[in-house]
Regions:
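Alpha-helical cap/lid subdomain in secreted, periplasmic
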Residues: 1-137, 141-374
Length: 374
């Protein structure tokens, strides 16, 4: 692989855990920061050697020490160490002319504001570490916003029905506008983008929240998900149909203000985007296995002089070291499959197939929109 863009973040595991309950957490932090800085210097040399690769450093999400939960006592001081690590990342980004995206402070601020109302609120799962679905969605929002995508609509259509005119169309094509004597408005609509489908179902291990809940804490819909249809010059109520499917009913006043089609989950274009979303989740599930395999190789086996040995001896070594690393048990089953090159090749081909299919399905289609007077 020769990526043109690389994003890099670290800090949660590097900042330690149970050591903050030990006899001398201050000494631990000093040792750990020296180790992190030394390793990061080596990382920077590698990244700088790839002149044609754009680097984006990410300040990772916080460890939520302030969430009130009697069953999970926090490691006090851990988040301060994470913040020290993020300062190293930010300084390196400035020095090397790399981009920097901050997840840490915006997530910390949402937790602060919401916990002032309810101390049991958190964007994390029950471990104070991993963001729940709404936290992950906020991370996606902050990343996309940092790329300058805020304020760019999915599409916008502005029609004056009384004058039978398309006043404006942004990021889309509008043709064949007709206004009948009975008050029906119809036209063809080809957007250049699809709406962003935010899952309203809690998915994933230990997840209790949904992606859509993130809209309560940031203007995601307003900034990134505007597919606006505005029609002026109407009276009464109108049924919106897209490709013959009844979507909803709106008053002339609502249509004059503009309705956000991206907020309607039953439109054909939204359902088209949902298909892409689910395919991408499958791609991510497979791609995650390669990351876990790489962790096992470089964090465990490389230290044993068995990097990419991928044989029974390597497997025996991993089993013998299960007690030395709390994360290894969770990766062992994945390694037992990915140690075979045929498995890695098959899964890599699946990723390529899923990506190709995603791009095929994601192509916007010409839709027929009708507003039928009731």
């Amino acid at each position: 692989k020769n990526p043109t863009v690389v994003t890099a973040t670290f800090g949660m595991n590097d900042s330690g855990y149970f050591e903050y309950n030990g006899d001398n957490p201050t000494a631990f932090v000093e040792r750990q920061m020296y180790r992190v800085d030394t390793t990061f210097q080596a990382m920077q040399k590698i990244m700088k050697s790839h002149k044609d690769t754009r680097v984006i450093m990410i300040g990772g999400t916080p460890y939520d020490e302030t969430w009130q939960n009697e069953k999970n006592k926090p490691f006090l001081g851990k988040n301060a160490t994470i913040q020290k690590i993020i300062r190293l990342q930010r300084e390196a980004a400035v020095k090397n002319d790399w981009a920097f995206v901050d997840f840490h402070n915006p997530v910390l601020e949402v937790n602060r504001v919401q916990q002032a109302k309810d101390p049991r609120f958190t964007l994390m799962q029950g471990d104070r570490i991993h963001p729940d679905n709404h936290g992950n969605m906020l991370m996606a929002y902050f990343f996309l916003k940092s790329q300058g995508l805020a304020g760019k609509p999915v599409a916008k259509v502005d029609i004056d029905a009384s004058r039978r005119m398309v006043l404006a169309n942004e990021n889309c094509f509008v043709n064949e506008l007709k206004v009948s004597d009975k008050g029906t408005i119809s036209f063809t609509y080809l957007a250049k983008s699809l709406p962003y489908p935010m899952d309203t179902i809690s998915r994933g291990w230990e997840k209790k929240h949904t992606q859509y809940e993130a809209t309560l804490y940031a203007p995601i819909m307003e900034d990134l998900n505007q597919e606006v249809l505005r029609v002026d010059g109407l009276k009464g109520s109108y049924r919106l149909e897209i490709d013959g499917d009844s979507i909803s009913t709106f008053s002339a006043e609502d249509l004059a203000k503009g309705i956000n089609l991206a907020a309607l989950t039953n439109t054909p274009q939204y359902q088209q985007a949902v298909r892409v979303m689910h395919l991408n989740e499958e791609r991510w599930n497979i791609e995650k296995r390669f990351r876990e395999y790489a962790w096992t190789e470089f964090y465990i086996l490389k230290r044993k002089g068995m990097l990419f040995q991928d044989n029974i001896a390597a497997m025996d070594t991993l089993r013998a070291n299960l007690h030395t690393n709390i994360f290894l048990a969770g990766h062992l089953d994945n390694y037992s499959k990915m140690m075979y090159p045929e498995i890695r090749e098959a899964w890599s081909q699946q990723i390529d197939m899923l990506v190709d299919r995603m791009y095929q399905i994601a192509q916007p289609k010409v839709r027929r929109i009708e507003l039928i007077k009731k």
